[in-house]
Regions:
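Conserved catalytic cores and adjacent C-terminal regulatory segments
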Residues: 1-186
Length: 186
């Protein structure tokens, strides 16, 4: 994976030639991690030490990069596990939307079904690995389940009103756990 770092002490190797973020801007790094093909075009990046590369969505780790963050904190940076506090924010779980006939046809394509399942399984697997591999790292995950029919959507949702409803649900999720989160970090 391509992991953009801005601190040389977080690098595992090649520290003598380290360039923060590979010389990319923050917007380029974000675009590279969101280039979910086949839905979006791959992102071309000019890495200062490596030349031009084609970056694609980091679906396997970008959905929940917890293991990378904790690995960096423990290893190159050297923070003891008992001093690490990890808060991870998921997108939540929603009912499947009713689809129009053409989306039903697309959804039946094995590659699309595999992609949707892979993205869901990836984030959940990372969560399980965190608990099993790093039991001494204190960790809270916020990723609530919503069953209400008006929240039925998938990762292709583009209606801004519905997406704003998701933002509000995210705020509600935080509000419900705000005291727990504040206590966790004190």
């Amino acid at each position: 994976p391509l992991i953009f770092k801005n601190r040389v002490d977080a690098a595992y190797g090649m520290k003598a030639t380290f360039i923060p973020g590979f010389g990319c801007t923050v917007s380029e790094a974000v675009r590279a991690s969101c280039s979910a093909t086949p839905f979006f075009k791959a992102c071309m990046l000019d890495l200062k030490n490596d030349g031009t590369i084609e970056a694609r969505d980091g679906g396997f780790c970008a959905n929940n990069p917890s293991l990378f963050a904790v690995s960096d904190a423990l290893n190159p940076i050297g923070i003891p596990p008992e001093n690490i506090r990890l808060l991870t924010l998921g997108v939540g779980h929603y009912p499947e939307p009713k689809k129009k006939w053409y989306w039903k046809a697309v959804g039946r394509l094995p590659s699309v079904r595999i992609l949707q399942r892979t993205l869901n399984v990836s984030a959940n697997t990372t969560e399980i690995q965190m608990k099993l591999l790093l039991p001494h790292v204190q960790h809270i995950r916020v990723s609530d389940r919503f069953d209400s029919p008006e929240l039925a959507m998938d990762f292709l949702e583009s209606n801004l009103n519905r997406l704003n409803l998701l933002v509000q649900k995210g705020r509600d999720s935080f509000s419900a756990r705000e005291t727990e989160i504040k206590t966790f970090f004190n």
